[in-house]
Amino acid sequence: MPKPAIKTAAKPATSSAGKRGKPITPKSVAKPQAAKPKTVSKPKVKPGEKKRLHPRNLHINGYDFPVLMVSYPKLKAFVRPTPYGDLSIDFADPSAVKTLNAALLQHHYGLAFWDIPKGALCPPIPGRVDYLHYLADLLFEGGKVKRAAAIRALDIGTGANGVYAILGHQVYDWQFVASDINPQSLTNVQRIIDNNPSLQGHLSLRRQQDDKAVFKGIIQASDRFELTLCNPPFHGSLKEASQGSLRKVRNLQLNRGEQPKATSATLNFGGQAAELWCQGGEKQFLATMIRESQAFAEQCLWFTSLVSKQENLKPCYQALEKLGVDTVKTIEMQQGNKITRLLAWSFHSQAKRLQWRNQIVSGT
């Protein structure tokens, strides 16, 4: 099936603050003179109205279950009516969520095959593709967003699902390097690639050997990336991750009007250890990422990451200010009741960013 068409959307509201003068290079660090980065102002939302997905998001109006069930018949077994007269699935059931994802990836994004092993993180497709749409806006800086096969992106911590790299290529034709510390995760992503001709030759995989590193050992001397992206491990320990999963299951049961009764045996928010938690949690992971980014400043146009906990933004801004980065932007995203932030930074001036991007897109 043809890949999704791209419509031009208005530039997302962001804020930026930057150092005037030459961008920092990995070999020399000037004293930061930039004003402290500012967070993006919260979008004005009418009372009772939720912030919607990105305007280009195919799922902005929810899931069309009747169409999906025709396109992907396996989904029928998991769809049931809600008390409000709509159709839905049990989002606490990993098999239901995985089947919905497979249906979405086939119907909307042209995948012939997608699967993950039991216990692996099963991400919601609308939220994942939202990140990519905002990255496209970031890269084109208010101009017309174009599909461009020359754009290279690095997905840090791709997991067993590989959805960022998969969606990034299917929607925007970007080329991806996807990294992970778990060899089993990479094996599964390779299986997905092998079963989808549209992905072959466009996604390459690299294993991170050092559990305390982010970019080191992954970015090679000859690499140049227009974008890096990451959804960091959220929790700081296995216990914390388990408690978080239990809360999610209970909240789903309450939303359905059920009596909370989840136990460890019914924690269906899948996720291997490296996908859900790391020592120090999201805060430490982001600190390492920011620190390491300086060494690869000339090889990457934009570094980006999701930030789930708002309180982790301040230490990120402080660390970026110390490095003297040229530009820092924060974009708020929301899917349902979940709010997250896209943090982006570049060591390059706007003029240099536009020159870099235009050379890549035009092929000169």
UniProtKB/Swiss-Prot annotation:
Domain of life: Bacteria
Compositional bias segments (type: Basic residues): 39-53
EC nos: 2.1.1.181
One GO CC term, this protein: cytoplasm
Recorded name of the encoding gene: rlmF
Primary residence: cytoplasm
Protein name (database record): Ribosomal RNA large subunit methyltransferase F
Organism: Shewanella sp. (strain MR-4)
Enzyme class, broadest EC rank: transferase
GO biological process, one term: rRNA base methylation
Lineage of the organism: Bacteria, Pseudomonadati, Pseudomonadota, Gammaproteobacteria, Alteromonadales
HAMAP family listed in its UniProt record: 23SrRNA_methyltr_F
Similarity-based family: Belongs to the methyltransferase superfamily. METTL16/RlmF family.
Catalytic activity: adenosine(1618) in 23S rRNA + S-adenosyl-L-methionine = N(6)-methyladenosine(1618) in 23S rRNA + S-adenosyl-L-homocysteine + H(+)
Keyword Transferase assigned: yes
Region of interest (Disordered), ranges: 1-53
GO molecular function: 23S rRNA (adenine(1618)-N(6))-methyltransferase activity
